[in-house]
């Protein structure tokens, strides 16, 4: 009788352990899915922000170009225009971030991919905002 009791208790413990392992695996896969969805949302928001900035920079660049067509540019103005053109090329390369990130991030895990994406955004957005601010400031000074 004791042997049957020991076998029954062992079987119950083993089945409970198997169920808990199965539940752990399911919760991990659900967590992975949620993390992936949140990364997609973050990328979507970043893409929208970059798209808006790109449109604003293109508008500012066109305005600056039309301003400088009829007038002479100083060396400083020429340098600002060169920087804006370089920024525009960088922004154009961000139109297809999935392809670029696929090439750059083969073999990385999701967290490293998210870190690379935010580093790239910071690297591009910092100079863009500075250049747009200085260009618009110069334009406002000349108009006003």
Swiss-Prot record:
One of its GO terms (cellular component) is extracellular region. The modification Asparagine amide is found at residue 70. Residues 1-18 form the signal peptide. GO terms for biological process: defense response to bacterium; defense response to fungus; killing of cells of another organism. Residues 19-43, 74-123 form a propeptide. Keywords: Amidation, Amphibian defense peptide, Antibiotic, Antimicrobial, Cleavage on pair of basic residues, Cytolysis, Fungicide, Hemolysis, Secreted, Signal. Maximin-11 shows antimicrobial activity against bacteria and against the fungus C.albicans. It has little hemolytic activity. Maximin-H11 shows antimicrobial activity against bacteria and against the fungus C.albicans. Shows strong hemolytic activity. This is Maximins 11/H11.
């Amino acid at each position: 009788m004791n042997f049957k009791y020991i076998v029954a208790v062992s079987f119950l413990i083993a089945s409970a352990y198997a169920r808990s392992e199965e539940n752990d695996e399911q919760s991990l896969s659900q967590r992975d899915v949620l993390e992936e969805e949140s990364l997609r949302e973050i990328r979507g928001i970043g893409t929208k922000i970059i798209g808006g900035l790109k449109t604003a920079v293109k508008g500012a660049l066109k305005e600056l170009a039309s301003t400088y067509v009829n007038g002479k540019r100083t060396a400083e103005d020429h340098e600002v225009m060169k920087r804006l053109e370089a920024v525009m090329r960088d922004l154009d390369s961000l139109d297809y971030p999935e392809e670029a990130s696929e090439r750059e991030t083969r073999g990385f895990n999701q967290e490293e991919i998210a870190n690379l994406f935010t580093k790239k955004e910071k690297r591009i957005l910092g100079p863009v905002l500075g250049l747009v601010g200085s260009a618009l400031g110069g334009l406002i000074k000349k108009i006003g």
